[in-house]
């Protein structure tokens, strides 16, 4: 019995050593392939104290495969303004409750770093009326803000307008981000768990690397006071923001008393962004691939787009 027990012990020890080698093999990551860039926002899981994240703290997964992180550039300090183009996108179907928030938006624009380029556009008839192209003259951007038309027919689907802006926005090396102010209601599609126009806007934004924050602001007409449509509108805004790596702001079905808390939170998030570069695992065809980010740094969460565009392998 003693010899049999000894033999089992040796076999168990050898098995344990073999199993312990598996994680080490799993940690091997590919060192060749297309390099993908994506903006990441670091937020605190609890409280407001956001930890500093270094490159070695970041882990990227495509499915079950771990990708190699090759770059992690803090977009603060010298890189903060130079790396940011910010478009305010306002729904022309918004009701007059938005009128009292224009001053909040003006002060938000004025508070941006001097090198941040700000643009202003209004969503109408499925396109964007750009009243101010991207400019670092923030006083000029302030002046371009106007009251929304308050016409339910002016914005059949805000997601048509989002897609239109993405297509017209020249690709640059800068961060490209949108603050969208709308009720989110798709008057063209209606409502339901899967809006193809929201899905298209999400995919186009992810492919272009554009982050879309949103603030719910009630619209006019019957849709503007239909709880069913309002509920779907808020869901669509949340989907658009969440899947592009941003935040959606709303409080119930009514207008907020002030945009200031939302804009302060947005400013805080912009100040804790990083440019992540990693080597992706390509498929046979180019396309969108889902990614997951992880970190073991306490009280830190990494927020980014749910999917990124990965070129085909050679």
Q: Where do the protein language model's features map onto the residues?
A:
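Bacterial N-terminal signal peptides
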Residues: 7-21
């Amino acid at each position: 019995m003693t010899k049999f027990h000894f033999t089992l012990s040796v076999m168990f020890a050898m098995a344990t050593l073999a199993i312990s080698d598996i994680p080490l093999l799993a940690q091997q990551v590919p060192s060749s392939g297309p390099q993908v860039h994506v903006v990441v926002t670091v937020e605190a899981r609890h409280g407001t104290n956001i930890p500093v994240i270094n490159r070695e703290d970041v882990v990227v997964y495509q499915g079950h495969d771990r990708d190699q992180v090759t770059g992690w550039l803090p977009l603060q300090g010298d890189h903060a303004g130079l790396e940011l183009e910010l478009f305010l996108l306002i729904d022309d179907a918004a009701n007059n409750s938005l009128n009292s928030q224009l001053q909040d938006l003006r002060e938000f624009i004025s508070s941006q770093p001097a090198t941040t380029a700000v643009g202003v556009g209004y969503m109408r008839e499925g396109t964007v009326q750009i009243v101010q192209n991207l400019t670092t003259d923030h006083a000029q951007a302030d002046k371009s803000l106007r009251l929304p038309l308050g016409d339910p027919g002016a914005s059949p689907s805000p997601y048509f307008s989002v897609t239109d802006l993405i297509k017209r926005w020249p690709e640059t090396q800068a961060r490209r981000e949108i603050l969208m102010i709308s009720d989110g209601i798709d008057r063209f599609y209606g409502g339901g768990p899967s809006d193809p126009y929201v899905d298209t806007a999400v995919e186009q934004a992810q492919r272009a690397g554009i982050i879309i924050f949103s603030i719910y602001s009630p619209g006019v007409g019957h849709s503007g006071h239909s709880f069913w449509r309002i509920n779907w509108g808020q869901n669509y805004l949340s989907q658009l923001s969440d899947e592009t790596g941003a935040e959606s702001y709303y409080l119930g079905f009514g207008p907020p008393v002030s945009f200031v808390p939302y804009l302060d939170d947005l400013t805080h998030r912009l100040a804790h962004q990083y440019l992540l570069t990693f080597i992706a695992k390509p498929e046979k065809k180019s396309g969108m691939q889902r990614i997951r980010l992880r970190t073991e740094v306490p009280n830190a969460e990494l927020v980014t787009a749910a999917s990124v565009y990965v070129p085909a392998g050679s």
